Amino acid sequence: MLSLLGLLLAFTFSMSASRFEARKQVVLQDANAIGTTFLRTQLLSTAGQTIQAQGLLRSYVATRLQIYAAPAGSPAQKAAAVQMQALQHDLWDLVATDSRQHPNAVSTALLLTSLNEMIDLSETQVTIFANHVPEDILLLLLIMSTITVAMVAFLNGKGGKHQRLFTIILAATIALTIFIVLDLDRPQRGLIRVGVGSVERAQAMIESKR
């Protein structure tokens, strides 16, 4: 029973850790896409369009940070998501208008490409952050853990202090492992969170270009 529980714990921890790493990667990609799009706004046809696009991107990166900071599914996160979509729409309209006016401009095509990637990554981030370890697996893990600890406690119940201590340590170790699995699987709450330093650095870069 202990061996089976160990395999299940290892499998679940691996699932949780891989999802955590995927979330870290999408945050980095998000920051890179925002930074690239900002730099390419200088390729717009007029200085006025560049200033307008950069202003929208300043608001956009601030909104992205609000989405990362807010608890998943909270009213604050939903409001920030609505604002983000409006900013994406405004940015796309601005760049698309310039592209229609200058259909042969390679520079505008480059900006459209990076803007499209930035918008796509915002949706990818939502999908990856919502991709949790299946609840059925977590439920099975909890049931298996409870049964295993109960069996060990029963078998060691008539033993001495050393056997009771072993049972306590085993239960604590299993509980701690499950806690870490759950914490890794919830990136916007708990103790272990996905860092957004790369997005903050992108924001600092954008603000420095005023």
PLM region descriptions:
Residues 9-28, 185:
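Transmembrane signal-anchor/signal-peptide helices with a preference for the extracytoplasmic
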Residues 127-210:
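Alpha-helical transmembrane anchor segments
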Residues 37-130:
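Structured inter-helical modules in multipass membrane proteins
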Residues 22-26, 79, 83, 110, ...:
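Short, contiguous, pocket-lining structural segments
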